[in-house]
Design a protein with these regions (language model features):
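Select subsegments of transmembrane alpha-helices in polytopic membrane proteins
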Residues: 65-70, 96-104
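Membrane-interface helix-boundary signature
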Residues: 2-9, 60-67, 88-92, 122-129
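Individual transmembrane alpha-helix segments
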Residues: 51-88
Length: 161
């Protein structure tokens, strides 16, 4: 199981996905013409106001269930997929779903950006953590390719016998 390179790719997806759960991916900043500078951060745990009078982070909005569910499913599916090493075709199908989920994360994120922009009237900026689903997508494609190569190798070995 661990000797296969796709397992390493899957473990990286799990580690990056767990990191994504706890890190903010967007910053919302009030426009320059506003009377007060306010900086919000958006992550899977919610929308947090970073700059306020007490300089203490304050959670403004919880219940971003779509973003939290998408973020939690990425490492969960990758972890389940590690233990399906004997069922390579099922593993490849799950990888395709995982790749779509990684791209779907950006769709869900776009919905929350649009809602926050309308509700708060702020400008948004991506934080480097926002690239994690894209990295997971690339790792998923690499793992899928290796899984399909393994399946072809096993079928070729069965024909030789």
């Amino acid at each position: 199981m661990i000797q296969r390179i796709q397992t390493v790719y899957l473990l990286l997806i799990v580690a990056l996905g767990i990191t994504l759960i706890f890190m903010p991916v967007l910053q919302f900043v009030t426009p320059e013409e506003a009377e007060e500078l306010r900086i919000y951060e958006l992550g899977a745990s919610g929308l947090t106001l970073i700059t306020n009078e007490d300089c203490q982070p304050e959670v403004c909005l919880q219940g971003l269930w779509g973003l939290l569910l998408t973020t939690a499913l990425i490492p969960a599916l990758a972890l389940v997929d590690i233990f399906l090493y004997r069922k390579r075709l099922l593993q490849a199908r799950l990888k395709i779903f995982l790749a779509l989920l990684c791209l779907g994360y950006y769709g869900v994120l776009a919905i929350y950006i649009w809602q926050a922009k309308l509700a708060l009237g702020v400008e948004w900026h991506l934080i480097p953590w926002a690239s994690i689903p894209l990295i997971c997508f690339v790792l998923t494609l690499m793992a899928t390719r290796r899984i399909l190569k393994d399946e072809a190798l096993v079928r070729a070995a069965d024909r030789i016998r």
